[in-house]
Amino acid sequence: MLDNPLAVRRAAMDLLARREHGRVELTRKLRKRGAPDELIDGALDRLAEEGLLSEARYLESFVAYRARAGYGPQRIREELGQRGLARGDIDQALRDSGIDWFEQLRETWQRKYAGRLPNDARERAQQGRFLAYRGYSLDMIGRLLRGCDE
């Protein structure tokens, strides 16, 4: 039971030591451990002031992690939105990531389909659905599956 400010801070720091967390996610995890909201807010405010809790670092880390796993910007945007982050902050993090999304798309497609272009409409639809599910735009998918680089 997290019933004093020091215990809440320690639990929050334990979670942050493992990986970056957003404020909403950290709040949810601390509530689950039984911490009252007023102690959570105070502890997280202090951690943010000290630079130990940073939404910007969390966004940067999450975008890079999911992009390495082969997910596109639309999927990442949706996942971050579900985690309670502001749409503007998410869009800014995606822009600042420096990721070449078309190259990410190509690598994801290469891993899944070994660079084999679809032979017919059924295969094209199958590959397109997979890549759209991964979070890439239909425009980018169309360019890739037509064999165009630009």
Curated annotation (Swiss-Prot):
Pfam families found in the cross-reference section: RecX_HTH1, RecX_HTH2, RecX_HTH3
Record GO biological process: regulation of DNA repair
Annotated Gene Ontology cellular component terms: cytoplasm
Subcellular location: Cytoplasm
Keywords, ordered alphabetically: Cytoplasm
Predominant subcellular localization, coarse grouping: cytoplasm
Taxonomy, superkingdom: Bacteria
Stated family: Belongs to the RecX family.
PANTHER family reported for this sequence: REGULATORY PROTEIN RECX FAMILY PROTEIN
NCBIfam families for this protein: PRK00117.2-1
HAMAP family: RecX (MF_01114)
Name the record gives this protein: Regulatory protein RecX
Organism: Ectopseudomonas mendocina (strain ymp) (Pseudomonas mendocina)
Lineage, uppermost ranks: Bacteria, Pseudomonadati, Pseudomonadota, Gammaproteobacteria, Pseudomonadales
Gene: recX
